Each structure stands twice: as C-alpha cells, then as structure tokens.
C-alpha cells in the first residue's frame, strides 16, 4: 500500500532540488521548510561505508555540539556512597543505587541518559536487556561510565550527546532545533562530521561517507555536499 503524502509535504518537497546543496544553503532550506505546528528538531541521516555486524566496523561515540541540542536532557545516575551526593549536587535529575536499578526493572524510564560509576556496572548489567534496546546502556566509550560525575553531567547538560551507526551503517542524529539559525546549525553539523571522521572504525574500507541528508522533523530530506562540509573551516 502506497503511503499517502500530505499536501503540505508535497509543497515543501517542491522547494528542494534534486542535488547536493552547499552546507549552509542546505541548513537555510531546512529552517525554511520547518513549518509544523510544534518545535521541530534538525536531524542528520548519514550513510557510512561500514558493516556494523563486524566489531571493527562499529561506530558508537559522543559529540559535543557547540551550540547545544536545544532541549533539556534528563540525566539519571547510578552510584553509591558519596558519589550519590556528588551527582545530586552536579544537577542530575534522578540519582540512586541498587534501589534505582530495581525501579528500572519495574518500568521506571523517566530519563534521557543514564550515567553509572564503574563499580555499579555489575548491577546495571542486570537491566541491560531493558536499557540496551533504548540506547540507554552506559558505556565507557560514550563517556557514561565514569567516576567524574560532575564533568559528565555538565557536558551532557551542555549539549554533548551519544550516537551510533545502526545495523545498516546509517547514523541518525538530532543536532539542534530548526529554530536555530542556519549558522548555529552549521557549527553543530561540522562538529558532528569532525567527530565521525575522528572515530572512523579501523575496519572501514573504501569510501567512508556515502551520503548525508538533513531535515526538520516533519520536513523533506535535503542532500548535503559532503566534500564541501569536510573542507569547511569555521575557525577562519
């Protein structure tokens, strides 16, 4: 059955040409086509030349978006002893020890990110089947397993986010809000591109970047010229 395309989407798609846009031009168009009745996010969809079924071709890391995400992140922390107070004082929204693990087992999921101290990971592993499918399982590589709770909480509150390539080698990531200026979105997108290049999996072969599209949550996909983005120097 063919999915019906709304009149609004048909009209928006007519504004997008079938070509790869210069990065800033693409983001200006993203902002222009964000016409939904709610605050839309800016999304990037990146196809990479990797096969994540092989461990040396997996990508999971974090990026610090210089202009932030535009949304409040609720952070939960699993710790014990003095680290509980440390996390609370640093601004964590939910803090607990074994009792928080039990609450998660019982269905508590009122947070966007879970940070754990290394000594609590054996307990956190008990709820791995619950956290894993939701992308919430703490990981040292993602910076969510650490004893330095104040720094981790500050960074994630300020706009650091975790992302990964899915099973088909595509990265789907929100890199701001459509209400941001195109220039601010460009700074965030450039930071994302730099991070993906710096964390290229050791087993990646051939052309690494296959395609890059951006869109507002309810907007049309806009192709971005990858070479132009990678060559861009925003420090000039």
UniProtKB/Swiss-Prot annotation:
<comment type="function">
    <text>Protein L1 is also a translational repressor protein, it controls the translation of the L11 operon by binding to its mRNA.</text>
</comment>
<dbReference type="Pfam" id="PF00687">
    <property type="entry name" value="Ribosomal_L1"/>
</dbReference>
<keyword id="KW-0694">RNA-binding</keyword>
<dbReference type="InterPro" id="IPR016095">
    <property type="entry name" value="Ribosomal_uL1_3-a/b-sand"/>
</dbReference>
<comment type="similarity">
    <text>Belongs to the universal ribosomal protein uL1 family.</text>
</comment>
<dbReference type="InterPro" id="IPR005878">
    <property type="entry name" value="Ribosom_uL1_bac-type"/>
</dbReference>
<keyword id="KW-0810">Translation regulation</keyword>
<dbReference type="InterPro" id="IPR002143">
    <property type="entry name" value="Ribosomal_uL1"/>
</dbReference>
<dbReference type="GO" id="GO:0019843">
    <property type="term" value="F:rRNA binding"/>
</dbReference>
<dbReference type="InterPro" id="IPR023674">
    <property type="entry name" value="Ribosomal_uL1-like"/>
</dbReference>
<keyword id="KW-0699">rRNA-binding</keyword>
<keyword id="KW-0820">tRNA-binding</keyword>
<dbReference type="GO" id="GO:0006412">
    <property type="term" value="P:translation"/>
</dbReference>
<dbReference type="InterPro" id="IPR028364">
    <property type="entry name" value="Ribosomal_uL1/biogenesis"/>
</dbReference>
<dbReference type="GO" id="GO:0006417">
    <property type="term" value="P:regulation of translation"/>
</dbReference>
<keyword id="KW-0687">Ribonucleoprotein</keyword>
<dbReference type="InterPro" id="IPR023673">
    <property type="entry name" value="Ribosomal_uL1_CS"/>
</dbReference>
<keyword id="KW-0689">Ribosomal protein</keyword>
<comment type="function">
    <text>Binds directly to 23S rRNA. The L1 stalk is quite mobile in the ribosome, and is involved in E site tRNA release.</text>
</comment>
<comment type="subunit">
    <text>Part of the 50S ribosomal subunit.</text>
</comment>
<dbReference type="GO" id="GO:0000049">
    <property type="term" value="F:tRNA binding"/>
</dbReference>
<protein>
    <recommendedName>
        <fullName>Large ribosomal subunit protein uL1</fullName>
    </recommendedName>
</protein>
<keyword id="KW-0678">Repressor</keyword>
<dbReference type="GO" id="GO:0015934">
    <property type="term" value="C:large ribosomal subunit"/>
</dbReference>
<dbReference type="GO" id="GO:0003735">
    <property type="term" value="F:structural constituent of ribosome"/>
</dbReference>
């Amino acid at each position: 059955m063919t999915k019906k395309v709304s009149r609004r989407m048909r009209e928006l798609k007519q504004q997008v040409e079938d070509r790869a846009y210069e990065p800033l031009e693409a983001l200006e168009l993203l902002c222009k086509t964000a016409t939904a009745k709610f605050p839309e996010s800016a999304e990037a969809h990146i196809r990479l030349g990797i096969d994540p079924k092989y461990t040396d071709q997996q990508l999971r890391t974090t990026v610090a978006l210089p202009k932030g995400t535009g949304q409040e992140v609720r952070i939960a922390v699993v710790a014990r002893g003095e680290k509980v107070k440390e996390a609370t004082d640093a601004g964590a929204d939910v803090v607990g020890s074994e009792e928080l693990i039990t609450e998660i087992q019982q269905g508590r999921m009122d947070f966007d990110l879970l940070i754990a101290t290394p000594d609590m990971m054996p307990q956190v592993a008990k709820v791995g089947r619950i956290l894993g499918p939701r992308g919430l399982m703490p990981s040292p590589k993602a910076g969510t397993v650490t004893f330095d709770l104040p720094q981790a909480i500050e960074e994630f509150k300020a706009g650091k986010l975790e992302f990964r390539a899915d099973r088909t080698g595509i990265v789907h990531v929100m890199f701001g809000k459509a209400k941001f200026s195109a220039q601010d979105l460009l700074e965030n997108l450039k930071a994302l591109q730099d991070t993906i290049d710096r964390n290229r999996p050791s087993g990646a072969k051939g052309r690494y970047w296959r395609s890059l599209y951006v869109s507002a949550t309810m907007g049309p996909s806009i192709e971005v010229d990858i070479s132009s983005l990678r060559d861009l120097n925003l420090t000039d």
